[in-house]
Amino acid sequence: AIAKRLTMYRLRSKVEITLPEDLAVQLHLAAPAPQPGVQVTLALGNERWMTIEIAQVANADSTETDADRAADFMQRWALAGITALQAEITADTTERFVPQMIGWDTVTPGGGISFGKGCYPGQEVVARAHYRGAVKRHIEVACFPAADLVAGSEVTLPDGRTAEICNIAVRHATETVALLVVGNQSG
């Protein structure tokens, strides 16, 4: 989806945008290599932290446990983002929300979007919503009993309002936490 979206910006350039099939992430520490099992914590700002547990050192074999740790890390990362009201747009939620609905205009420093002269898809809608103050939805966190919730789907809240799911994370085996885009209450 990223490569497809980036092709909109190549204009008349004769450039082909693709992503490698074997994309991987590596962490290089400017210190002696820690042993497997050691945790490294990084502060990312806005009350959000990332803890990396060293699962393997270069050339060590991967195990099923590594996959389980990666899945657990991704759930904890998603939960931290939801708790901090930091929406992440995925393939299921692409082009579903105006940036102000998910709080990107309040990201610090300097805001997460520019309202100045620009040329990107949807810029007119984003600027109009900003200058008219006409954003009719906002983000909230909600907890649900463990359920098969899907980002991009609609749910009905206990107070009768409907909301669209932006992000989800499993907190416990019995509870799912979601970042919702909810209509503003009138009145």
Regions found by a protein language model. Name each.
Residues A1-G187:
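Basic, glycine/lysine-rich polyanion-binding surfaces/domains
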